[in-house]
Amino acid sequence: EFLTAEALPPETSLFAAAHHLGLLAAALDMERLIAESELPADAPVLAHNALASYFAAALIMPYEPFLKACRDMRYDIERIGRRFRVSFEQVCHRMTTLQRPGQAGIPLHLVRTDIAGNISKRFSLSGIHIPRHSGACPRWNVYGAFLQQGQINVQISQMPEGQRYFC
């Protein structure tokens, strides 16, 4: 029996159940992947969690239908979330994984921060450098996002080397 808290949003409960299913159903595959990798000794627990999360996202938002929805809906995060009955963050995270050769989505990056700029989640397939051991750049618009909740804030960020990213 798998129980989740009644107070959790339905999309969070669904993801938790799919994550747990991944830990059970794909345990041998995960063990093999981790054993064949050259991860540091303290990484297997994190790797299990990451692989189970990927499993959950792939189960709830299968690659091809999700990529088609992204293209058809022009990457409208809220519409895609309604279609797959998932949260805004879950859509954004899944979008960062759409890099299958010959069937790639737009290379995106995802950063989750707190109001102080501490980064708690980072994924970058766009090429943008996201700090691993420090806060976000004070010029990023992530700080303003906390002052305008419920709105999507956009920004063009230029790196010291001249690269430009849509954030």
Regions found by a protein language model. Give the residues of each.
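Conserved binding/catalytic microenvironments
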Residues: E1-C167
